[in-house]
């Protein structure tokens, strides 16, 4: 974990966003991965009922996304260590969500900023979501409703 990581500051996140990160930890542990990364956050976002109000209005096929994410996670190396590190892609995603928070003038990083930052993630978020027809414009329009 880098010293300036946002994950060291839970008070910078809404409860929903922090809970998303905590549940992502469990996903990483379930896969026996040593790094928690974007591929662990996405399944929680698409399958946990707490995030349905943000996900359900979007033109996404959560089942197809979850299948793709399972395949991706299965291809990642497993580890035997007890330490769980924050992956670089997740750090970059959270930095992007922080930038989105600042632009929006929001007090805390919340799920909408994380969703927008996912569209900037070149490794996994953007390819999966754009292939499903999600765009920043569409996401911003949905968030206004």
Show where each model-derived region lies.
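Histone-fold recognition with a strong bias for associated Lys/Arg-rich disordered tails
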Residues: 1-145
